[in-house]
Amino acid sequence: MKFGQALSVFEAALPEEFAKPYRETLTKLQESAPPLPAKVVHKVLAKELGDDWRDNFTSFEDQATASASIGQVHRAVWKDGTDVAVKIQYPGAAEALVSDLNQIQRFSKIFGLVLPGVDMKPLMEELRARIIEEVDYLYEAEAQSACYTAYENDPDIAIPRVVTATTKVLVSQWLDGKPLADVIKSGTQKERNAAGMHIARFHFTCPDRAGLLHADPHPGNFRLLEDGRIGVLDFGACNRLPDGFPEPFKNLLKHALDDNAQALYDGFKKDGFILPEVDVDPNLVLEYLVPLVEPLRTPTFKYSRDWLRDQSARVGDPRNPTAKIGFQLNLPAEYVLIHRVTMGTTGIFCQLEAEGPFRDEALVWFPEIAPVA
């Protein structure tokens, strides 16, 4: 399910003749999974909230409203009259994820042969740590509450307030709005642009405002509210960044925008993106990062499926020397979730075909990356 949700974002990179038949099926993975029977739901609620769990609600819908990843969501009304979303973890989901991770770790040596530039051990350790957090809804509640406090009065971004939580149940304020998948499918260009810019602003600002980076960007986790704000859901996967975005990340972005291939290469070496025993052409490294920096080179930029397909074809063409770079670069563990967010949001923006001043938005929050005039 987690893989399917990630894949549904990157359908934008597929050629249209292949993407079209899969688009609707993949998008369903962002919000759909087989629902739990009501009796199982009641059993989980009784175990987590107590046998008198119904006393907490004035109403509770037994039929799940949405299902995704490791849990499902029920609509209810809390005892104080607040409309709430009740997220219930599938029984056995935590054990299944850990089992899957153990299977992946068995193949880590093979991955190392395919990707000789990558140090697999710290990546596996980071993945394990994040999975342990993601299956504990108390971690999620903590992250969501921090973001709610940071964005409580924000004109563009809405975070649902946490009502109560246990390790397996999370009760939050209900957010009404148009699912981002619907905006992608039939939204106006104004809606598409607004959604893209608001999501960009959220990810640019969250580390400095909340000390976190929401690290599960797929359309099922966003809603466009009637008042124009973007609603953000599911804080199970978050990167704790108490000092904001890492300075090395911003430095590398600046070197790329300056077209300073040597400084970029030196930074990659220093920060572990290129292992000591690996030697690559600095100019090819710079060229490989075009999808990251091109949207920040012009006053406005329009993301599109065609653009993403072109970029994917360029770095995936074995005849192109740039394609080999992806197999030679390392991904330090502390950048795994930042990379996930960068790739995921790029896919979303291309699905939306969003257009806007992404460069100016980035410079508001990261003025130090401004290229040398």
Describe the residue ranges of each PLM region.
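Broad phosphate/nucleotide-binding scaffolds in NTP-utilizing and phosphate-metabolizing enzymes
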Residues: M1-F204, G211, L225-G231, F235-D243, ...
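Catalytic-loop of the protein kinase fold
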Residues: R209-P219
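Hydrophobic residue at the +6 position relative to the catalytic HRD Asp in the kinase catalytic loop
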Residues: G220-L224
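Short amphipathic alpha-helical recognition elements used for nucleic-acid or partner binding
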Residues: P248-N251
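Conserved phosphoryl-transfer catalytic core
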Residues: D259
